[in-house]
Regions:
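Short glycine-rich, polar/acidic loop-and-turn segments at beta strand-coil junctions
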Residues: 1-2, 27-29
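Charged catalytic cores and adjacent phosphate/nucleic-acid-binding surfaces used
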Residues: 8-18, 22, 29-47, 61-66, ...
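Caspase-like (clan CD) cysteine peptidase catalytic core
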Residues: 52-54
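Phosphate-binding/switch loop-helix module in NTP-utilizing enzymes
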Residues: 56, 60
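Short beta-strand/loop segments at the ligand-binding rim of alpha/beta enzyme cores
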Residues: 67-77
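Divalent metal-dependent hydrolysis catalytic cores, especially in the metallo-beta-lactamase
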Residues: 1-5, 70-72
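Histidine-centered divalent metal-coordination motifs
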Residues: 1, 75, 136
Length: 186
């Protein structure tokens, strides 16, 4: 969270190994009042502000959009304190959903029910769906996928694709080895 360290590692250690494997630079931003929000900025932009956690979502949205980026809630129906649908910001202003560009509709570390609700929400608001592994361990990398056209190779191309509300194919496999999976839901 709040770090591009995974992207930096790929860029410096793995990027030249497989030219056909495309990695987009993004961040899961931990807001003050709206849980985790995925942010993707244009490839040539270095905005260190994204690595400082705790900004309110009503400040994050215009910053991201003014710099040409896109954003959407990660695991919106997941654990209470990390998920948008349980947040103070959503409860104060449900219409804030219309300010997002996409919604994570499949998260490999969330339940089928949580993912199904996220998909329904994306359809209701006509937002592009994405998927993520939410990997915090190397063993859970690759449990989710989002299919996009092959010609999209840069963040700016992905941003335009999503801004035009293009639909994607998303899915994956639920990763059962999370702490919640071992201990049960809180």
């Amino acid at each position: 969270h709040d770090s591009y360290d995974g992207y930096r590692y790929w860029k410096h250690n793995i990027k030249n190994v497989d030219k056909d494997f495309v990695v987009f630079k993004g961040i899961e931003y931990d807001t003050l009042d709206a849980g985790h929000i995925i942010v993707i900025m244009p490839e040539n932009l270095k905005l260190r502000l994204m690595e400082l956690r705790g900004m309110p979502v009503q400040l994050l949205i215009p910053i991201v959009h003014n710099y040409g980026g896109i954003l959407g809630p990660a695991h919106p129906f997941g654990e209470k304190f990390m998920s948008f649908m349980n947040s103070k910001a959503y409860k104060r202003n449900p219409d804030i959903l219309s300010e997002f560009d996409f919604i994570e509709v499949f998260n490999a570390c969330e339940s089928k029910m949580a993912n199904d609700k996220a998909l329904e929400m994306a359809e209701k608001y006509n937002l592009t769906g994405t998927a993520g592994s939410d990997s915090h361990k190397t063993e859970s990398i690759g449990y989710a996928y989002t299919v996009i056209p092959d010609e999209i190779r840069k963040e700016s191309q992905l941003i335009e694709y999503i801004k035009h509300r293009n639909k994607t194919e998303c899915g994956g496999k639920i990763y059962e080895n999370t702490s919640r999976g071992k201990l049960g839901k809180a």
